[in-house]
């Protein structure tokens, strides 16, 4: 490319970034992808790597959608657990009225400190979310789910009444209000969403998410989560194999995907990921069925290796640190300085 065109392109890119914010446009191979965005881990090592910044970005809107029982709420509860481990505060706006505190506790959530709201209407749910964001004291706000945000007019109306586009208008208005507050308070807001089928679609994907198009536009990250298989121990099913696609990502290159296991009553199998990614990266050696690290055998078969790492958390931490160093961009000195100044 000649010099004049290069200058014109860099001027255009600069103008786009000034007008629409950092990350509005980037080169696909750009590994420096907005390094200074703070992130909260998802609880899955593979997904943190696929997201490019080590987790979900703070000060942004995130949408997680998928079919029923695909792991949407499990993933968000893991994010809450990770946030609390870092000393953060989390809130769960339970529009579905289906949060199970016992299950949340098993995933590592401190339910005593978790703020929970079970609103009556969609307007109330989004107003509560907005007030929590504006307080500036909450790190993560989860809305479960967009499909359950029922407009007040629909609740007060008769069962057969048609309320066309009410929910979409509600979401559009709420997100217009929320976005600026979210950026200012540096809060991560996660909307869980369900899938619906478009009628009469002959070609292309008939699936769509509820609540209109506003959330698709306002979300910086959109995750499509699917169950791909079952994990069995003998005849007993002990968990799900899960795949997450990063459908949209404004803070790093998109379209990456992560595969991990969700074990019933335990959540995302972090140690299983450490072993799998460690083998891919050559950090953990696999010879036949045996796994070894630094010449030391850690188990025959993945289950035994996982048990060994559970008993030796310092070794698991060391392997995970090496994996993160290899895949995730190093934080810039400027971001570290800002963080230490805040502390």
UniProtKB/Swiss-Prot annotation:
PROSITE patterns named in the record: RECA_1, RECA_2, RECA_3
Chief place where the protein resides: cytoplasm
Keywords (A to Z) from UniProt: ATP-binding, Cytoplasm, DNA damage, DNA recombination, DNA repair, DNA-binding, Nucleotide-binding, SOS response
Pfam families with a match to the protein in the record: RecA, RecA_C
GO biological process: DNA recombination; DNA repair; SOS response
GO cellular component, one term: cytosol
Name of this protein: Protein RecA
Originating species: Thioalkalivibrio sulfidiphilus (strain HL-EbGR7)
């Amino acid at each position: 490319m000649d010099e004049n065109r290069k200058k014109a392109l860099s001027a255009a890119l600069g103008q786009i970034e000034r007008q629409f914010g950092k990350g509005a446009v980037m080169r696909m191979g750009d590994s420096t992808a907005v390094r200074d965005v703070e992130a909260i881990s998802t609880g899955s090592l593979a997904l943190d790597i696929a997201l490019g910044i080590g987790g979900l970005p703070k000060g942004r809107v995130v949408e997680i959608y998928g079919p029923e029982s695909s792991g949407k709420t499990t993933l968000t509860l893991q994010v809450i657990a990770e946030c609390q481990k870092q000393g953060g505060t989390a809130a769960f706006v339970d529009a579905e009225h289906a949060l199970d505190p016992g299950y949340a506790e098993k995933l590592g959530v401190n339910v005593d400190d978790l703020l929970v709201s079970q609103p009556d209407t969609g307007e109330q749910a989004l107003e509560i979310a907005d007030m929590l964001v504006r307080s500036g004291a909450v790190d993560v706000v989860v809305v479960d789910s967009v499909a359950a945000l029922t407009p007040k007019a629909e609740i007060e109306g008769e069962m057969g009444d048609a309320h066309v586009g009410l929910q979409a208008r509600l979401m559009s208005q709420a997100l217009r209000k929320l976005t600026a507050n979210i950026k200012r308070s540096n809060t991560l807001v996660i909307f869980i969403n369900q899938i619906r089928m478009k009628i009469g679609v002959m070609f292309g994907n008939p699936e769509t998410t509820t609540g209109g198009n506003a959330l698709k536009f306002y979300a910086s990250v959109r995750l499509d989560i699917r169950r791909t298989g079952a994990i069995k121990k003998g005849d007993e099913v002990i968990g799900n194999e899960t795949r997450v696609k990063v459908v949209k990502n404004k803070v790093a290159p998109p379209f990456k995907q992560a595969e991990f296991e969700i074990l019933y009553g335990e959540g995302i199998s972090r140690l299983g990921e450490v072993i799998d990614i460690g083998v891919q990266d050559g950090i953990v050696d696999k010879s036949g069925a045996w796994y070894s690290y630094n010449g030391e055998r850690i188990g025959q078969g993945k289950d035994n290796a996982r048990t060994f790492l559970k008993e030796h958390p310092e070794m698991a931490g060391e392997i995970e640190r090496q994996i993160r160093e290899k895949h995730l961009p190093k934080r810039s000195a400027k971001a570290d300085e800002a963080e230490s100044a805040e502390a």
